[in-house]
UniProtKB/Swiss-Prot annotation:
Transmembrane domains' residue ranges: 11-31, 47-67, 70-90, 96-116, 139-159, 180-200, 225-245, 263-283, 300-320, 321-341, 349-369, 378-398
An example Gene Ontology CC term for this record: plasma membrane
Organism superkingdom: Bacteria
GO MF, any single term: galactose transmembrane transporter activity
Family the entry assigns: Belongs to the major facilitator superfamily. FHS transporter (TC 2.A.1.7) family.
Gene transcribed to yield this protein: gluP
Matching Pfam families: MFS_1
InterPro entries reported for this sequence: Glc/Gal_transptr_bac, MFS, MFS_trans_sf, MFS_TsgA-like
Any single biological process term in GO: D-glucose transmembrane transport
Localisation per UniProt entry: Cell inner membrane
Membrane topology of the entry: Multi-pass membrane protein
Protein's UniProt name: Putative glucose/galactose transporter
Keyword annotations from UniProtKB, A to Z: Cell inner membrane, Cell membrane, Membrane, Sugar transport, Transmembrane, Transmembrane helix, Transport
Function: Intake of glucose and galactose.
């Protein structure tokens, strides 16, 4: 009976990961959409990612403690409700035409995603004893399905409802801002429906079913966890930085409009989806850390080629990085939380805080891009910022993942 419950739980969690990916990737549509509406610089536009991923740092530890008390199943329900609230706030934000309101709504929405992330990832690993990395990669493939469909959804329902002229009136800009209202209202309704479904399913609280430990080391005494949390920081920062500026790079270097450029995001995030489905199969034969090292090295090579070669080849190389990003988050997470026992929920909260890399790295790249724009230099040099992130991931895959003998 327990095995059936665990299988049902894993299956239902695919909806959670799908929604997280779908909503998160819409930020890559919001940046080029809101930039001309509010006359933003690259740095100001990147504040969308700062507010969204900043919520991970502020709320990750909070939800880690909350979920350790209420359990993973109720943590999932709570996450969906908060997410729905944030999505609904996009309606008044667009109505008043306030960029600050948009950022506030994004923070609340992101807080819901943080709660889902904090509950969902360890939930999967605890349901998958002996197959933690493989099953988390498989379930997160549905996260990538969401990130693949998100740009299509966003470009059709948001960009198609906007005007393309560079000299829009204030009224036209407000009308363009309102194009996000119905899509996000729909996401709010969908989130509430998922909250109801998860509540009615009565998922098993696997952590409470684990035997209590008489002694417990400090979470931060586990070096593999500390290195892993930093790995998540740099992975999310690098991935989000590339995704955030990919559309703007295509616009600038290939003279494509925003809607056409957004289609390339499908290849970036779609590559991650393909890589995760493939990775879940290959991890039966390849050690997770070795697979991670190969993908990190491949990403380094692709970004370096993009910077050195430039042109169409560079942008296609950056797009292909998405494929190698595929297994990084679930693999780093599973390696970092391995054998942590009852510290797992708190560890997940700290790792959720580490996702703040997505808030800090893109603005750094934004500042570098603004500097390069001012001096009319090659914008691709700014991709040196995410390049450095992948070097750390390579370190974690080769050495940082190792547990101490007495862990």
């Amino acid at each position: 009976m327990q095995k059936t419950s665990n299988t049902l739980a894993l299956g239902s969690l695919t909806a959670l990961f799908f929604l997280m990916g779908f909503i998160t990737v819409l930020n890559d549509i919001l940046i080029p959409h809101l930039k001309p509406i509010f006359d933003l610089t690259y740095f100001e536009a990147s504040l969308i990612q700062f507010c969204f991923f900043g919520a991970y740092f502020i709320m990750g530890g909070v939800f880690g403690n909350v979920i350790s008390k209420i359990g993973y199943p109720f943590g999932v329900v709570l996450g969906f409700v908060i997410t729905a609230s944030g999505c609904a706030l996009f309606y008044p934000a667009a109505h008043f035409g306030s960029y600050g309101f948009f950022l506030g709504a994004l923070f609340i929405l992101a807080s819901g995603i943080v709660c889902l992330q904090t509950a969902g990832n360890p939930f999967v690993t605890l349901l998958s004893k002996g197959k933690e990395a493989r099953n988390l990669v498989l379930v997160q493939a549905f996260n990538s399905l969401g990130t693949t469909l998100g740009p299509i959804f966003g470009s059709l329902l948001i960009f198609s409802a906007t005007k393309t002229s560079d000299n829009l009136s204030l009224i036209d800009k407000l009308a363009d801002a309102k194009s996000v209202q119905m899509p996000y209202l729909g996401l709010a309704v969908f989130s509430l429906l998922l909250a109801l479904v998860m509540y009615l399913l009565k998922l098993p609280d696997v952590e409470k079913e684990m035997p209590k430990e008489t002694t417990q080391k400090s979470l931060f005494s586990h070096k593999h966890f500390v290195f892993g949390a930093l790995g998540i920081f740099f992975y999310v920062g690098g991935e989000v930085a590339i995704g955030s500026f990919l559309v703007l790079s295509f616009e600038k270097l290939l003279n494509l409009d925003a809607q056409s450029s957004a289609h390339y995001l499908v290849y970036y995030w779609g590559g991650a989806m393909v890589g995760r489905f493939l990775g879940s199969a290959l991890m039966n034969k390849i050690a997770p850390n070795k697979y991670l090292a190969f993908n990190a090295l491949s990403s380094i090579i692709l970004i370096a080629l993009a910077i050195l070669i430039g042109g169409k080849i560079a942008l296609f190389a950056l797009t292909f990085v998405g494929f190698f990003n595929s297994i990084m988050f679930p693999t780093i997470f599973s390696l970092a939380t391995l054998n942590l026992g009852h510290l797992t929920s708190k560890a997940s909260g700290v790792i959720s805080m580490a996702i703040v890399g997505g808030a800090l790295i893109p603005p750094i790249q934004g500042v570098v891009t603004d500097m390069l724009t001012a001096t009319e230099s090659n914008l691709l040099y700014a991709y040196s910022v995410p390049l450095l992130c992948y070097f750390y991931i390579l370190f974690f895959a080769l050495k940082g993942y190792k547990q101490e003998e007495n862990s």
